[in-house]
Amino acid sequence: MALCLIVTRPAAQAADWVRQLSALGLQAEALPLLGIEAVADQAPLLAAWQDLTACKLVVFVSPNAVQHFFAAAPSFAPNPPATWPSAVLAGSTGPGTTQALRQAGVPAAQIAEPAAEAAQFDTEALWSRLQAMAWTAERVLVVRGESGRDWLADVLRQQGAEVNFVAAYRRTPPQPDAAGLALLAAASSQPAQHLWLFSSSEAVACLHALAPAADWSRSRALASHPRIVQAARDLGFGQVQITAPTVQAVTQAAVRLGSPGPGADASGQAPGQARGPEGPSIQLLDL
């Protein structure tokens, strides 16, 4: 049986990933482990739009942040691409967010993003592109969900910037349909035929909430960041590999796992790749 890749991103993104992965020849199915919806109070978003030109930088932490921020653009604003002020930088934490910004009409020259060869895509990698700039007395807006990491804001404040947050969306617990529950049951009972793809630590936590008694020790996962790798390890996944959050990199990783090399055991684990007492194995992919 072909290896089935389970995409756990929010529904709209998961559907797009499944389409792209399927086009590359993978068997992929969506099991969204996070719901995303607009915040009930849109007033702060409208105020942020009205004050946009006062900012030197607006940081978007995810494609969801881009989608919901632009969806809240006031009615008096013209349609993209004319909505984005020419003097304001848009900060992106990775390729998915950059793509969303481009689709929203932000010119490529105004997007600050991690280097393509960055070891990981996050706010730390974004800061490596921003740290050479002067930030004293500059205003920065961070667009995110109702909660998130404050690391970049703290660093910018240490450099003299005035940093504010605006919540563009909220995360909600997953509500899988009958097909989703069937996929969850199959993945739990037939781990050798399934491979999980995690793009957030919250998704891993939601999986535990959906199946608190599940034994994941024989299950495998791909994760797009070391923090997500650790979350999957903590949940008990037997094998976790880190990969870049791109369709191409995920495809390469899934093909490797679906085609075990000579001498691999039934789980696809090669000799010498021991799990050991310190926990499940982590293999860094050279993609």
Regions found by a protein language model. Name each.
Residues M1-G268, G276-L287:
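Conserved beta-alpha
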